[in-house]
């Protein structure tokens, strides 16, 4: 991945990396503009998200280059707020909104479509909003 990033040939490279503060994640944080960490609302999901954030921060990396995205979650506002509260002490930015676990998204993916290509306007808008939040965060960091 490092060669592709350094080549300058690409506007965007998406890397599905291992979780936790592994050696590969530590090397990625040095070369990426934004490290997006997907997670759910439960503590079982949040704990393994906070671990690499804290590990990277403890090694001197700023949380500014990281962002959490909630994906595959319920549409519960109280769970959303509780997850935000859980993440607050580690100081990692959170992309506004969430991508809920919906049948319409599963059906879209079964057809090879992106979440933003769901035929249903409500779910599609939720996915669009989160994607736009990632774009906005990346734009802020790279300008």
Language-model segments: residues:
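Inter-motif core of Ras-like GTPase G domains
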Residues: 22-42
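Beta-strand-loop-alpha "switch" segments that mediate conformational coupling across diverse proteins
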Residues: 74-76, 84-116
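Conserved C-terminal guanine-recognition region of P-loop GTPase G domains, centered on the G4
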Residues: 47-64
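Short histidine/acidic/glycine/proline-rich micro-motifs that form metal-
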Residues: 41-43, 71-76, 121
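Switch II (G3) loop of P-loop NTPases
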Residues: 5-25
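Structural beta-sheet core signal
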Residues: 15, 37, 68-70
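NTP-binding/hydrolysis catalytic cores, primarily Walker-type P-loop NTPases
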Residues: 115-143
